[in-house]
Amino acid sequence: MSNTWLVVGLGNPGPDYSHTRHNIGFMVAEELASRIGASFKSNKSRALVAEGRLGMGGPKLVLAKPQTFMNLSGGPTSALAKFYDLGADNVIAVQDEIDIPFNTIKLKIGGGEGGHNGLRDISKALGAKEYLRVRVGVGRPPGGQGDAAGHVLKVFSTAEKKELPFLIQDAADAVELLISDGLLAAQQKFHPAK
């Protein structure tokens, strides 16, 4: 397994989307870039990319924010994986998840995309579903009713905005733990006991 990890924060480019639920992946990628002292730069893969090491002599992180809109995230992800010679097992996608309550993080590898078109496009472009996912709960519309697509394109509520910095930090911690200690250890920390 390579000592380089591609972490793809899913979101939509542009100021109209920057503070929406759908862009939580971008927010987590930005937090990780801040932690490793890296800046995002344009890349011919159609993504903003930041690179650095996780700790002194630690694994290399390639952080990506695809600039193709959410549903076309696969092209930039696949291009970067190919450029860095990474298999799907060294790719981590950070995504919003409406089927998980706000302020909750779930981690998994592979499986279905749960109706998330960004993940669907990544799976298709990589030719594999066996990549890690950091699923950041953004919850459903109030009352569980309403337009889910419209909900993820809205900004967080006032109450959610107070908790958002902590959620972003936790999701970034989850990415770091996935890389340093593996999926099982990260799940034990972030999945509440039943």
Curated annotation (Swiss-Prot):
Top-level enzyme category: hydrolase
Catalytic activity, as annotated: an N-acyl-L-alpha-aminoacyl-tRNA + H2O = an N-acyl-L-amino acid + a tRNA + H(+)
Enzyme Commission number(s) of this protein: 3.1.1.29
Recorded superkingdom: Bacteria
Site positions for Discriminates between blocked and unblocked aminoacyl-tRNA: N12
Subcellular localization: Cytoplasm
Chief place where the protein resides: cytoplasm
InterPro entries: Pept_tRNA_hydro, Pept_tRNA_hydro_CS, Pept_tRNA_hydro_sf
UniProt keyword terms in alphabetical order: Cytoplasm, Hydrolase, RNA-binding, tRNA-binding
Catalytic site: H22 (proton acceptor)
Residue stretches spanning the membrane: none
Annotated Gene Ontology cellular component terms: cytoplasm
GO biological process: protein quality control for misfolded or incompletely synthesized proteins; rescue of stalled ribosome
Binding site for tRNA: Y17, F69, N71, N117
GO MF terms held by the record: peptidyl-tRNA hydrolase activity; tRNA binding
Residues under site feature: Stabilizes the basic form of H active site to accept a proton: D96
Purpose of the protein: Hydrolyzes ribosome-free peptidyl-tRNAs (with 1 or more amino acids incorporated), which drop off the ribosome during protein synthesis, or as a result of ribosome stalling. Catalyzes the release of premature peptidyl moieties from peptidyl-tRNA molecules trapped in stalled 50S ribosomal subunits, and thus maintains levels of free tRNAs and 50S ribosomes.
Family of the protein in this entry: Belongs to the PTH family.
Oligomer and partners: Monomer.
Name assigned to this protein: Peptidyl-tRNA hydrolase
Source organism of the structure: Renibacterium salmoninarum (strain ATCC 33209 / DSM 20767 / JCM 11484 / NBRC 15589 / NCIMB 2235)
